[in-house]
Amino acid sequence: MAGKSSYDYEELLACARGELFGEGNAQLPYPPMLMFDRITEISETGGAFDKGFIRAEFDIKPDLWFFACHFIGNPIMPGCLGLDALWQLTGFYLGWLGEPGKGMALSTGEVKFKGMVTPSVKKVEYGVDFKRVMRGRLVLGIADGWMKADGEPIYAATDLKVGLSKQSAVA
């Protein structure tokens, strides 16, 4: 899979259905929780730490589900959804590398919000730059991420951690 460098919306939906990386491996959430429309670039090299990166975009439309409820009269995309997008991309990258197991967000270091996504925003861009991928009982990706709204940096997160485990989330 590491040969492909971009993914369109239909391919992301295939990943959400468990069809992209094989049964029992990394999946994206299905809409409306899928927080990007395309992956524009993914690479095992480059990025801020020269250990790989992933970039994605989300087209913002005024009728997106979260604007109707967060907040009435003051619509704003919840910050946690932007953070979740960064975790989603981190897990996708691990699956793209061919690592086995289901993904789970584990933690993040510091998160800073410097702006908001409102219905007037046209496009959100995400970037995740990998610091390390650890392979053991659990595959662990550690990365820093950022988010831009119409080209302006608005979120930054350090030490995003996502793990892949062969164990089911259902006990």
UniProtKB/Swiss-Prot annotation:
Q: Which GO terms describe its biological process?
A: unsaturated fatty acid biosynthetic process
| Catalytic activity from the UniProt record | a (3R)-hydroxyacyl-[ACP] = a (2E)-enoyl-[ACP] + H2O; (3R)-hydroxydecanoyl-[ACP] = (2E)-decenoyl-[ACP] + H2O; (2E)-decenoyl-[ACP] = (3Z)-decenoyl-[ACP]
List GO molecular-function terms, semicolon-separated: (3R)-hydroxyacyl-[acyl-carrier-protein] dehydratase activity; trans-2-decenoyl-acyl-carrier-protein isomerase activity
Q: What's its EC?
A: 4.2.1.59, 5.3.3.14
Highest taxon of the lineage: Bacteria
Catalytic positions?
H70
A GO cellular component annotation in the UniProt record = cytoplasm
Biochemical pathway: Lipid metabolism; fatty acid biosynthesis
Q: Keyword Lyase, does the record have it?
A: yes
UniProt-listed SUPFAM superfamilies = Thioesterase/thiol ester dehydrase-isomerase
Recite the UniProt keywords alphabetically.
Cytoplasm, Fatty acid biosynthesis, Fatty acid metabolism, Isomerase, Lipid biosynthesis, Lipid metabolism, Lyase
Localization terms from the record: Cytoplasm
Look up keyword Ribonucleoprotein and say if it applies: no
The family line of this record is: Belongs to the thioester dehydratase family. FabA subfamily.
* Function of the protein: Necessary for the introduction of cis unsaturation into fatty acids. Catalyzes the dehydration of (3R)-3-hydroxydecanoyl-ACP to E-(2)-decenoyl-ACP and then its isomerization to Z-(3)-decenoyl-ACP. Can catalyze the dehydratase reaction for beta-hydroxyacyl-ACPs with saturated chain lengths up to 16:0, being most active on intermediate chain length.
Q: Assembly and partners?
A: Homodimer.
Full protein name = 3-hydroxydecanoyl-[acyl-carrier-protein] dehydratase
